[in-house]
Design a protein with these regions (language model features):
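Walker B catalytic acidic pair
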Residues: 314, 320-321, 332
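Peripheral, non-AAA+ core regions of ATP-driven protein-machinery
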Residues: 1-233, 243, 345, 500-522
């Protein structure tokens, strides 16, 4: 009997756990048995691996093979275990200490083709981060994943000045076997990505705000939303630019920093699909109004996949025709909006997906879309019921409400301000708020993220503005959460204006954006 070992990883959500792959080659009829809560993709790899080994001019054992994936209690899914299982089987009879040492320090990822080539797999970034946490020396990925793997920040040994973990890229099973036996060298993922020209690919171009005709109130609302990370809702007749403004909101946001880029790219990697390069700008996700709860939050049979809210992590989630989305689906957004993550409970495990996004809702004022109630053809009860699916608790979590005007009210506008011009003010406001929260020791990426109690206690508006907030709360026209959101809005407006503290005018503008009419004494 002979025993081979290799390392791979199991991915649950956007977190990976290192998995020990053991292969026992012993007497018995020629067959392979895989144990350890493996899914269908892993179980079906038997014939694929055997054919790939034969076509790579390598030797497959002609006896019984038992492959164990541990920890056995953890569900495992995906074809990325192929390479690790092949290497554990092929090296089971090896007595070379170098082979054993290399495999004990290396995480192997990749799906094998029938010709022995390695095919790219999903979830490379979470595995790299898990290997880095575990202190392993290297990770080998398919060359098709080189650009994604090149994003990881590899720690450096302070004494030796060399990387503590290397990320290598291989094109075939035979090449990895040659490396294991110290016959060939594998290139780094960074060098392969540079040769492929995909290591620094840009995300799709964001449309310009100058394309939006008129709508000064909605444009201003989008600027405030971008500066403070606030959620917003637009209501107006069809064709007034609601979707255009929402699609241009990511262009007003600052580019993602290195950490945000890795996090957002990791979510898209776990979701699968073709890798088009790192997520460098805030993503924009706009599912159809027929979206289901599982498509919005994530889920699916087997290992859950991230939904639209997670794909919009560090970006914008736009739900057009919000009045057509079932109330149960919309209400499922309440917890992610508050906590910044999605928790899916399964029988064997819980899955967590990050979901820190800006929500933008858009809807027509009524089914017929008329701007003026006098010209509306809908029955009164139908008009009143039109937006009833947007519950009070969800409305309470929105910061900005804005009405877009009909086409006749915006004709003749030209030379509107560009995205680049607005973004300069947004970036300046964000830098101003970030410096303020940093000096105070408050952990927040934007004004929206500041704890409400800290804001009320340590960062109130001036006395007149706070009195106005208290009066509005006392009238019962808004909840305490609504007042907190207005105070955050006031801070964002003050940051855009370059003020050191929100005043009465800033609070009045916040009331207007929040949808509460306010009269300000001269």
């Amino acid at each position: 009997m002979a025993l081979g070992r290799a390392l791979s990883a199991a991915i649950v959500g956007v977190t990976a756990t290192i998995v020990d792959v053991e292969a026992n080659v012993g007497p018995g009829l020629p067959r392979i048995q895989i144990v350890g809560l493996a899914d269908t993709a892993i179980s079906e790899s038997r014939d694929r691996m055997k054919t790939a080994v034969a076509n790579s001019q390598l030797h497959w054992p002609k006896t019984k093979v038992v492959v164990s994936l541990s920890p056995a209690s953890m569900p495992k899914a995906g074809s990325h275990f192929d390479v690790a299982m092949c290497l554990a089987i092929l090296t089971a009879s090896s007595t070379d200490p170098l082979v054993r040492q290399r495999l004990s320090e290396t995480v192997l990822l990749g799906e094998v083709g029938l010709d022995g080539s390695l095919r790219p797999v999903a979830g490379v970034l979470p595995v790299l981060m898990a290997a880095r946490r575990a202190g392993l020396r290297r990770v080998i990925v398919p060359q098709g994943n080189a650009a994604e793997a090149a994003l990881i920040d590899v720690p450096v040994d302070q004494k030796l000045g060399t990387p503590r973990m290397s990320v290598l890229a291989a094109r075939s099973l035979a090449q990895i076997m040659g490396w294991v036996n110290d016959l060939v060298e594998l290139p780094s993922a960074v060098s392969v990505a540079e040769a492929q020209g995909t290591g620094a690919s840009e995300s799709a171009a964001v449309p310009d705000m100058a394309d939006v005709c008129g709508q000064p109130e909605a444009r201003w609302a989008a600027e405030v939303a971008a500066a403070g990370g606030h959620h917003m809702m637009m209501v107006g007749p069809p064709g007034t630019g609601k979707s255009m403004i929402a699609a241009r909101l990511p262009g007003l946001l600052p580019p993602l920093d290195a950490g945000q880029c890795v996090q957002a790219t990791a979510v898209h990697s776990v979701a699968g699909g073709v890798f088009h390069g790192p997520v460098l700008v805030p993503p924009f996700v706009a599912p159809h109004y027929s979206v289901s709860r599982s498509a919005l939050l994530g889920g699916g049979s087997g290992m859950p996949r991230p939904g639209a809210v997670s794909l919009a992590h560090h970006g914008v989630l736009f739900l057009d025709e919000a009045s057509e989305i079932p109330a149960s689906v919309l209400d499922s957004l309440r917890t992610p909006l508050e906590e910044g993550e999605v928790r899916l409970v399964r029988a064997r495990h819980d899955v967590h997906f990050p979901a820190r996004f800006q929500l933008v809702l858009a809807a027509n004022p009524c089914p017929c879309g008329a701007e003026d109630p006098s010209s509306c053809r809908c029955l009164a009860r139908v008009r009143m019921r039109h937006l009833s699916n947007i519950s009070g608790p969800l409305r309470d979590r929105l910061d900005i409400f804005v009405h877009t005007r009909g086409v006749g009210a915006v004709l003749g506008h030209a030379g509107e301000e560009s995205t680049a011009s607005i973004r300069k003010r947004v970036v300046a406001a964000r830098e101003r708020s970030a410096a303020r929260w940093s000096r105070a020791g408050v952990r927040a990426r934007s004004n929206r993220d500041v704890d409400s109690q800290v804001l009320r206690r340590e960062f109130p508006a001036d006395d007149a503005a706070m009195a106005l907030l208290a009066a509005y709360l006392g009238n019962g026209d808004v909840s305490q959460r609504g007042v907190d959101r207005m105070l955050k809005l006031a801070w964002t407006i003050a940051d855009l204006a370059g003020a050191s503290r929100p005043g009465l005018d800033h609070v009045a503008q916040a009331f207007e954006l929040h949808g509460a009419p306010v009269e300000v004494a001269a």
